[in-house]
Amino acid sequence: MPQIFHHSTNALAKITIYGAVFIGVALLWVAVELNRSSWNTGQWVEKQQPVQFSHKHHVGDDGIDCRYCHTSVETAASAGMPSTNTCMNCHKQIWADSPYLEPVRASFRTGKPIGWIRVHDLPDYAYFNHSIHVNKGVGCSTCHGRVDDMPIAYQAATLQMEWCLACHRQPERFLRPKEKIFDMTWRTENKSAEELQEGMTWKADYKVQGRAVLESCSTCHR
């Protein structure tokens, strides 16, 4: 029987198969990298605000405690955003006539809230409660990064599920003393054997739930 295909067809078929596999793997790699990139997660992206509030100045330079502005962080799901009255407690006397703060004064006069842009925007299907994390030994900087070094606030973590699960699977890696919850200089992760042992102690003292609860879908998706 005469040969229908040229003998080079075998090589062409192999090249096609290998090429398809390579392209498939490459596309999968690109998809994974895009999913983890700042383009998708918003990590490292500075958000321009109506008034460029500097955490570096207020927290880092002036030493203002997180709870002065985020008053409900220890008692509610939301940490809370400060009202304009909170801003004006200081700025009636400090920078009282600065053009830079005119939007703040206008908000104070009219009673219309400042339209802050959300920095950490969790999807609606994810439930997060600030108070339970704070009261179980998770510090602000563990999730939010060193805000005392941020002239403009940005999202320091991906906020993706694998990031959340890293802590829920091994909370002892990220716990700290309760008196250090709002301390920006405290370590964000326990790495050495001694630090991990401390983490295990805090985990027991704070009665942190086990993996069965922390990894349950309903814990974060309600």
Where are these regions (language model features)?
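A short, flexible N-terminal coil/short beta segment enriched in small residues
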Residues: Y18-F22, C90-W95, P99
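N-terminal export/targeting leaders of redox proteins
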Residues: M1-Q52, K56-G60, I64, Y68, ...
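Short Cys/His-rich "knuckle" micro-motifs
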Residues: A76-G80, D97-L101, M150-Y154, F174-P177
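Soluble extracytoplasmic domains of inner/organellar membrane proteins
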Residues: D124, I132-K180
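The canonical Cys-X-X-Cys-His
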Residues: G63-S72, T84-I94, C140-R146, W163-Q170, ...
